[in-house]
Amino acid sequence: MNQEQIKSFWNDHPCGDHIVGGLHQRFDDDYERFFAAYDAWRYDQESHIPAMLDRVDWRGKRVLEIGLGQGAESEQLIRRGALWSGLDLTDESVDRVRTRLAARALPYEDLRQGSVLDIPWADDSFDLVFSHGVLHHVPDVHRAQAEIHRVLRPGGALVAMLYARHSLNYQVSIRLVRRAALAAAYPLRHSGRLARAPMLRQHLDNAERVGLRHYLALDTFTHRSTDGPLNPFARVYSTQDARRDFPSFELVAASKCYLHAPPLPVRRLSLSGRRMGWHLWVRLDARPESTPAQGVPAETAWTDEFGEVSL
């Protein structure tokens, strides 16, 4: 897996675009209508995001956002007083976010296309780095976290959303339900009975290409089960995993949100995502250069630390 494959996928499949019908398809390149529809969908489905952002003091802070999507959180951060700069791997996302911010006359410091593996800013440039749903798509996350540490000022922090290992989506939907459903559908892949299920059809094509057993291996299937069957890379995190993969930081706060486990109808149950939510929000404080991590602490029972620690 290389960065160009990841860049190509996200350039062709901007995050969330297809869910509201597509900027170039349903909305005929009408950016304002598209952004309005996208934001309405996003903050209905993920209504916790504004409240989670409110737990951090952004005002007057130099903030770098890594991975921009459609710019929904970019706008939220700027409206909360952040001195915002943005970085995305794809030209498509950079263009969309630039259009959004210009149309809404929102001030910002900088917006660049580039890689988290080689962040195009000088050392000690930012007070905070924010990344929502991006770093779990970076294979070389150790290099990425070192680069984030480099551009943070002493005392800076990374606030990130990572896909949660201990979630209903991963432990039940991905590991059990979806793999079992795909195995059951596999004998029907040439029958023509699945023509109206394009996502399942793509999974079956993937499985036929590499072999069903290999495709259903969890290390393979996870990549293809978080952001569509063409997504090249994804991983899931516990708090222990976050400590391991971000050794330049100290994990000081964590919280889970967003009960999401398709095809299970969990939204109808009105359950909290606090224990089995798909989104693991973490605050990681940059360690001083001379203070390496002291091993990886054991995983502990879940507590909603993010709401209890001053951010």
Where are the language model's segments positioned?
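Conserved alpha-helix/loop element of class I SAM-dependent methyltransferases that forms part
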Residues: 30-61
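A short acidic, Gly/Pro-enriched loop at the edge of an enzyme's catalytic core
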Residues: 117-128
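Short alpha-helix
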Residues: 232-254
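N-terminal, positively charged/glycine-rich alpha-helical extensions of SAM-dependent methyltransferases
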Residues: 1-35
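Conserved class I S-adenosyl-L-methionine
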Residues: 157-209
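Core SAM-dependent methyltransferase catalytic element
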Residues: 267-311
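Class I SAM-dependent methyltransferase SAM/SAH-binding core
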Residues: 62-64, 70-118
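A short glycine-rich, Lys/Arg-flanked "PGG" loop and its adjoining helix->strand segment in the class I
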Residues: 142-154
